[in-house]
Amino acid sequence: DEFIKVIAQQNQMHVLPDSTKVWMESGSSIKYTKAFNKKREVWLEGNSFFEVYKHEGSFFQVHINKAFIEVKGTCFQIKQTNAEKNEITLFHGKIEFNVESTGEKIIMSPSQKVMYNPNNAQTLVENVMDINWKDGRYNFKETPLSQLISIVNQIYQSNIILEGKFTKQPSFTGSIR
């Protein structure tokens, strides 16, 4: 098969032939066959967010390091921070995470994250805060500032700390890209 490979030089959105949107972080790459619409498979290196276009009777697969995600039409994010740490976060819809070496399958629900180590095939599922994601943006409405900081720390693997005392808990309404 002939492949098309897209390498993100900066954060960018790429639209696949089936209208699926992929928001790629700088340095990430995806590849797929020229006959993509016949078999919807993508191979990912790096971090990307997928908004999969739903096609009745047609699955969508994303291959990562010794595992793959099977999708039916949904929004999810994949972070591959190093050779030992892969994270898949489901925002809405339903996906199935598959470990190739063990055959383990995890059906994910919205607001769940699977952490996967491809070196030993270990998986861990945890619930994350309810996050609204649309068109490349995380959207918040009257979210308490402490909760917003916790979400930002999860998403961007940062360590922001809120200091000071407030008589009233500040909140945030807006979007973060």
Predicted regions and their residues:
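A residue-level detector for the "anchor" residue at the start of short, highly conserved motifs
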Residues: 1-177
